[in-house]
Each structure stands twice: as C-alpha cells, then as structure tokens.
Design a protein with these regions (language model features):
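Thiamine diphosphate
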Residues: 1-148
C-alpha cells in the first residue's frame, strides 16, 4: 500500500512519451498524497485513478478471507475530498459518482495536459482479484470468491 504513485512517477520520468496511469485505493493514496505536489511542480503527467470506498481495501479483503469478516481498523470515513486536495497541489481533480460519467471524465482527464486525479466512488463491498495471501506463492492466489 502506498507504492503505486511513486512508482508511476518514476515510470513517467523514465518514459515521458508514454501515458502512465496508476490505480490506487483511497487508503493507499492517503499514504503518499504529498507526492501530488511534485507531479505539478515538475510537470510529471501521471493520471491517478483512485478507487474510493472509505476503507483500507486490502485489509478488508484479508479480514474477509482469513478472519471470518471480523473487521477492525479498516474503515476510513474521513470525508476526504481528493479532487480538492489534488487541486490544492496544482493537479486537476475529478470526481465520479455515477457509472455514466466514467468514460466522459476519463476521456477529459486523459486528454488534459499534466497530471490528473480521478476519484471514483465505489461500493465498500468491491474486492480486487486476483490476490495472493501474505507468505504464499503465486500458485496459491485467490481468483475470486472465498479463500481456499
């Protein structure tokens, strides 16, 4: 958690002619949101797509699988306004609530010069697959549904 944005910045600096997207959860982006400032300051045109569900999604998913859905310390509920935060650092910010707005906003954000942050509201029940449990090998990955 928290690795995606700095890694995307490095990729964009290394390959400035390429379009670089980073997909991040809202919990992950909060771990390094200060990195939005250098995007603007140094003209690093990364497009940041935030899947915003007010949870630490990886933690929730692990608690689903291995702790019988006994959730603790994984809800954010901080009323954060990520597009406003991005704007305060010179990065264009967007917010998507409705599925119908997804493609028009993505087209606009991808076409804009410079960095952009697209904050997409998703359900707290969304999960990310595949996932590899800690300490396990790729052959132990979970492709969806319940843990093996």
């Amino acid at each position: 958690m928290g690795y995606g944005l700095p890694a995307a910045m490095g990729a964009k600096v290394a390959f400035p002619e390429k379009t670089v997207l980073v997909f991040s959860g809202d919990g992950s982006i909060l771990m390094n949101c200060q990195e939005l400032a250098p995007l603007s300051q140094y003209g690093i045109a990364v497009k940041v797509i935030v899947l915003h569900n007010d949870t630490l999604g990886m933690i929730v998913q692990l608690q689903d699988f291995f702790y019988n859905k006994h959730y603790t310390q994984c809800t954010l509920n901080s009323r954060k306004n990520l597009p406003m935060l991005a704007g305060s650092m010179g990065v264009r910010g967007y917010h998507i609530e409705r599925e119908d707005d997804l493609f028009p906003v993505l087209r606009e954000a991808l076409a804009c010069e410079g960095a952009a942050l697209i904050d997409i509201a998703i359900s707290k029940d969304e999960r990310v697959y595949p996932t590899v449990p800690g300490g396990k090998a790729l052959c132990d990955m979970i492709l969806g549904g319940e843990a093996r």
